Amino acid sequence: MGDWSFLGRLLENAQEHSTVIGKVWLTVLFIFRILVLGAAAEEVWGDEQSDFTCNTQQPGCENVCYDRAFPISHVRFWVLQIIFVSTPTLIYLGHVLHLVRMEEKRKEREEEPPKAAGPEGHQDPAPVRDDRGKVRIAGALLRTYVFNIIFKTLFEVGFIAGQYFLYGFQLKPLYRCDRWPCPNTVDCFISRPTEKTIFILFMLAVACVSLLLNVLEIYHLGWKKLKQGMTSPFRPDTPGSRAGSVKPVGGSPLLLPPNSAPPAVTIGFPPYYAPSASSLGQASAPGYPEPPPPAALPGTPGTPGGGGNQGLRARAQNWANREAEPQTSSRKASPPAPTPPAAESPGGGPQQSLPEGAAGSSGDSDGEGAVTAVELHAPPEPPADPGRSSKASKSSGGRARAGDLAI
């Protein structure tokens, strides 16, 4: 049989990167399969076809009976079994060597002087080896190792079933054959049937032990990962996980995590304007002047405290001064301009310009708006009518009128 040294060296390298049960499995494969098969099985099955004899002189009958009794030699069958069962382990070893080589290249690139700045955000993969220098069985390597065990188990089961259907688990000394070109049923005899039966049972037991080790290794890996998941600390509460807990699903309402404060709702209010109280205690909303006074109907009696025409002129003058208030405030903000000549009032008398002390501006502390309060007085009557001027002077004295409006 061929040399097993090359396969043995490969499997020895794979043993360094296996679990404890995997190392036991490889030991069983080395000692109880490869060594026993190379040392003893060839000696037992070396004279298999030469010592297979049949009680006939028909040419070719003995060969066809041997082919029917042993479709494939036991030794070659076990060699194929060893190769197929070892192939998943060799694939796993290739994956390990690939990862180790990639890590070595990465270290070489890190030792080289940096060249042009590459794209940022590149994260280096996790190191393949741990602190003790052993290869970590995790991630993609763990998946490869699990598939390695699964395929080894399937190959073991397949070869055990194939051996049973081809030969059975026992060789009988007598084999009856009626295959053409034998003239009739002939008796054929197998050499050393008891010794061969012992070898068959031994190799079957080794295959069952390997199958049991594969099952235990799968259980060991599953229990180990489950234990790590139970004993590992909880993941930190990241902003992404917090945002994912509030994300609506399928248009359903937001689901807040337990023990969380209700979301804050901001309600907007219109700006608050402080009312400006006049000297008579009356209040009016700033920025909303009263409508102009209605026109006096003929025959309507005048307001008390003065003639009817005098009251109408005073109210009209108040309204005109209110309309001119925005212009007055804009002139205060601009540089002083020459004072225009006094305009005539509707009553025929010159209208005096408002003194600076007559208008005061009061602004809100928050800067929301400015309110200007203006006190307006009726102009004096011409001296032609002494009775009317006395009444006007009495009504337009230093005190405020009832019809005046503070803005």
UniProtKB/Swiss-Prot annotation:
InterPro entries (UniProt xref): Connexin (IPR000500), Connexin46 (IPR002262), Connexin_C (IPR034634), Connexin_CCC (IPR019570), Connexin_CS (IPR017990), Connexin_N (IPR013092), Connexin_N_sf (IPR038359)
The entry's keywords: Cell junction, Cell membrane, Disulfide bond, Gap junction, Membrane, Phosphoprotein, Transmembrane, Transmembrane helix
GO MF term (any one): gap junction channel activity
Intramembrane segments: 2-15
Modification after translation, per record: Phosphorylated on multiple threonine and serine residues. Phosphorylation may have a role in assembling connexins into connexons and gap junctional plaques, as well as channel gating.
Residues spanning the membrane: 20-40, 72-92, 149-169, 198-218
GO cellular component, one term: connexin complex
Basic and acidic residues bias (residue ranges): 121-130
Spans within the Cytoplasmic topological domain: 16-19, 93-148, 219-407
Biological processes, Gene Ontology terms: cell-cell signaling; gap junction-mediated intercellular transport; visual perception
Disulfide bonds: 54-188, 61-182, 65-177
Record's function text: Structural component of lens fiber gap junctions. Gap junctions are dodecameric channels that connect the cytoplasm of adjoining cells. They are formed by the docking of two hexameric hemichannels, one from each cell membrane. Small molecules and ions diffuse from one cell to a neighboring cell via the central pore.
Name of this protein: Gap junction alpha-3 protein
Gene source species: Bos taurus
Organism classification: Eukaryota, Metazoa, Chordata, Craniata, Vertebrata
